[in-house]
Amino acid sequence: MTFKAMLMLGATAVGALSVASGAQAADGKEVQMLHWWTSGGEAAALSVVKQALAKQGYSWKDVPVAGGGGGAAMTTLKAMVAAGNPPTASQILGYYALDYADAGKLADITPLAKTGDWAKVIPTALQKFTTVDGKWGAVPVNIHSVNWIWINKATMEKIGGAEPKNFDEFVALLDKAKKAGVVPLALGGQPWQEATMFDSIVASTGGVDFYKKAFIDLDESALKSGTMKKSFDNLAKLRDYVDPNYTGRDWNLATAMVIKGDALAQVMGDWAKGEFAAAHKEAGKDFLCYRFPGTDGSVLYNTDMFAFFQVSGDRQAAQTALAETTMSPEVQIGFNIIKGSAPARMDISDASFDTCGKKAIADIKAANAKGTFLGSLAQNYAQPPAVATAYYDVVTKFVHGQIKSSDEAVTQLVAAINSAK
């Protein structure tokens, strides 16, 4: 059954109807936002948008759905749209936005895009997801990249560590932490977190061209190659440096382990930096940010977008206000400083950003210019959700020992992706 067909069936489940009933706007001055930004840093960043809208006379109604990967939120959104009560807008990732556009459920905000010259300031790679057939139905709030390592500086100094320049040096650094009695690697044992880390491992092991061939092009020779096997071998090496209590841990709790010095490092997208900021920690003083060893010069990106749905006429002014406010330079700066991300607009100065933020902005511009700005498979920017889900399934089974060897993991990855395509 197609995505469009599922929506056209309507919301038949009782739970779907109960969720959808909460989406009816009280009046035309209310912005209803479905999102999964429930951690401290995320909530603080979202408040920048809320406050900017409040100055324009708009109230805000959160429809929060916890879960860092957004899977639960997308299930809720599907129910709301199917029931005929979509929110003003929803946080959304990649191919999910295209699904709603193809189903004819998104509003057309192209006039706003033309007035604001958004096509000139937003990377072309992102516009693939904000537009369909030249019509804008979503706006990017930020640009995140997943190929980062976050390190507690005091712990790093305590163990005598240095920035790892390649994968072997990273393993050696983790080994130092282990011998010092510190948890080397903070990880949450959830499929999306494990897959996010594996994105970086694949790009490091095979290089950015291999990552593109395997995950963007879905080239079967790359997927079944010795390089992919080695990538799983390297994932197994990192798994050995994770504490035994990681299963089911939320990503922000793993970040908190690094913030508190209970763990040395975390491999995570730069939304983790928002948690450091919320804890009043400073880049370079309290924590360090490095590109995952072997991925310098490339950016594996995702972008949080706000997708706008077809709503009644009295709710459209709120949509316009939200879209214009989100794309304003002031909000792009204020939001992303707190969130830990880079602005989605390429014309924003980095003057107000910390050292990690400046590096993120510079890296994105450089990668965008030389063709190494590539979508994260784990974050739904390399392939549609069905393929990403198949990827999650194989990676998490390998991490948790249900798949016993790298050879078996490669075989299952090829089969799962071929089945999902």
What is the meaning of each model-derived region?
Residues Q51, I159, D240, A278-A342:
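Extracytoplasmic/periplasmic substrate-recognition and gating elements
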Residues W136-V141, V171-E220, A263:
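Extracytoplasmic/periplasmic solute-binding protein
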Residues A23-L98, A103, T115, E408, ...:
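Conserved N-terminal structural module of periplasmic/extracytoplasmic solute-binding proteins
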Residues T110-T124, A162, G189, T205-K230, ...:
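Short, solvent-exposed loop/beta-turn-alpha elements that line the ligand-binding surface or hinge
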Residues A79, P86-T88, W118-I151, V183-P184, ...:
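A structural signal for short loop-to-beta-strand junctions that line the ligand-binding cleft
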Residues G94-V146, V171, M197-D199, G357:
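Hinge/lid segment of periplasmic solute-binding proteins
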Residues L174-K176, I216-T247:
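Glycine-centered hinge/linker elements that transmit conformational signals in sensory
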Residues P140, D347, A362-I417:
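C-terminal capping/gating helix-and-loop segments adjacent to ligand/active sites or protein-protein/ligand interfaces
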